[in-house]
Design a protein with these regions (language model features):
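A common structural junction motif
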Residues: 235, 327-339, 391-399
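Conserved N-terminal alpha-helix of the aminotransferase class I/II PLP-enzyme fold
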Residues: 35-85, 110-117
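Short Gly/aromatic-enriched secondary-structure transition segments
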Residues: 40-47, 325-327, 389-391
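Short, well-ordered beta-strand elements within core beta-sheets of diverse protein domains
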Residues: 250-259, 307-315, 373-377
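Conserved PLP-enzyme active-site core in the AAT-like
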Residues: 6-14, 76-283, 297
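N-terminal "arm"/small-domain region of PLP-dependent enzymes with the aminotransferase-like
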Residues: 1-58, 66, 372
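PLP-dependent enzyme catalytic core of the Aspartate aminotransferase-like
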Residues: 116, 125, 139, 146, ...
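Conserved small-domain helix->loop->beta segment predominantly found in fold-type I
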Residues: 269-343, 357-363
């Protein structure tokens, strides 16, 4: 039976304290007990439904965590204060000094910096690889390899990982496969493809209004409980705790995620095809020319399409900057990082979201100075948007 993540979200039923249709927001950092013994039992983990301190958990955070676990079809989830809060906690929970990680050569700049610069200082080895090359992944496996870390669709080059095949490699070698699914919520369900842990930056599509920073870790109940353990849990001890007000806001926005993802994807596919037709070098997983188009099709929940991210290459950084500035001036969208907003966002990743990656490594992986990354918005008239963008390209002699 086909998995329908939007149905899982629709079927959530949380009541407010006084019968409200939205669950009540717990606006407290600490909680009272009727007896000292109840407090002791709660600290020991022997009671259900009791709260101690909001760094441990709060009702609002548990509501959102439950919703995200349903969406990703995992046993449990835990929300964090940012996407990086989720990524760092997972890797530090799974790995220790002397362990080894295999990861994609093209990943979000903050993740790259953590893996490249931070973890080696704590005695962990990291190898970066073309994540689409399964033989290369296998060749890098060592006896101490504990994690294969990847993004479903890589940032910013939009390389598509074969999550099912990589998960099989992980299981064969007793290696945990961790997937950042930020670019493809609803569209791809990594846990159904064998991934052990699924991460999102909630800041992006899931929240969708660029007014909140947050993250989530989805996995087995045992793993989530380990992360929240008061003695050695990375989420508990690192303290990347989401505010209850923000949890409540994101939970409400999740109710429209299925509508938004369909529109983001439809608009992006239209623009990708239109850019192709006028001779602009375009990368989008929904184009048949994308080297991993068929792999994406084999993984996706097709009603949500191929996502809202695409790139074009205009040749040089100077041209890229000029195009973006003119697009902002003509109200195509905003010259800004991040993604998943209702307006189109665009940036030159080599000097922004991937600037942590050294220039020589950017060149080696194919991240050119002229690359513009688009997060396509919810525009009602995407043909009008294309004409605006085309006018910018024409006026700057890009086409």
């Amino acid at each position: 039976m086909m998995f329908k993540p939007a149905d899982k979200i629709q079927d959530l039923q949380f009541f407010g304290e006084f019968g409200g249709v939205n669950p009540s927001i717990s606006d407290s950092s600490t909680y009272t007990f009727l007896s000292a013994k109840s407090m002791f039992d709660t600290f020991e983990g022997n009671t259900d439904g009791c709260y101690l301190y909001s760094r441990h958990s709060s009702p609002s955070n548990l509501y959102l965590s439950a919703a995200l676990a349903q969406m990703e079809n995992t046993e449990a989830a835990n929300v964090t204060a940012s996407g990086m809060g989720a990524i760092t906690a997972v890797l530090m929970q799974l790995c220790k000094k002397g362990d080894h990680i295999i990861t994609s050569r093209t990943i979000y700049g903050g993740t790259y910096a953590f893996l490249k610069n931070f973890l080696p200082e704590y005695g962990m080895g990291v190898d970066f690889v073309d994540i689409t090359n399964l033989d290369k992944i296998k060749s890098l496996i060592k006896p101490n390899t504990k994690v294969i870390y990847l993004e479903t669709v890589s940032n910013p080059l939009l390389e598509v990982a074969d999550v099912a095949a990589i998960s099989e490699i992980g299981k064969t070698n007793n290696i945990k496969v961790v997937v950042d699914n930020t670019f493809s919520p609803l569209s791809v369900t990594p846990a159904n493809l064998g991934a052990d842990v699924v991460i999102h930056s909630l800041t992006k599509y899931i929240n969708g209004s660029s007014d909140t920073v947050g993250g989530v870790i989805c996995g087995t109940a045992d793993f989530i409980n380990d992360l929240k353990n008061v003695n050695n849990g990375a989420c508990m001890l690192f303290g990347s705790t989401m505010d209850s007000m923000r949890s409540a806001s994101i939970l409400k926005n999740m109710r429209t995620l299925h509508l938004r993802m369909k529109q983001h994807s439809a608009n992006a596919l239209y623009l990708a095809k239109a850019f192709n037709e006028i001779g602009i070098k375009t990368v989008y997983p929904g184009l048949e020319s994308h080297p991993s188009h068929e792999i994406y099709k084999s993984m996706y929940n097709n009603e949500y399409g191929f996502g809202g991210m695409l790139t074009i290459d205009v040749g040089t950084l100077e041209k890229a900057n000029a195009v973006m500035e003119l697009m902002q001036e003509r109200n195509v969208g905003y010259l800004a990082v991040s993604l998943g907003f209702y307006k189109t966002l665009f940036s030159a990743p080599g000097t922004s979201t991937s600037s942590e990656i050294p220039a020589d490594e950017q060149l080696e992986m194919g991240l050119s100075n002229g690359l513009i990354r688009f997060s396509i918005g919810l525009d009602n008239d995407i043909e009008r948007t294309f004409e605006l963008i085309k006018s910018c390209l024409k006026d700057l002699n890009v086409i």
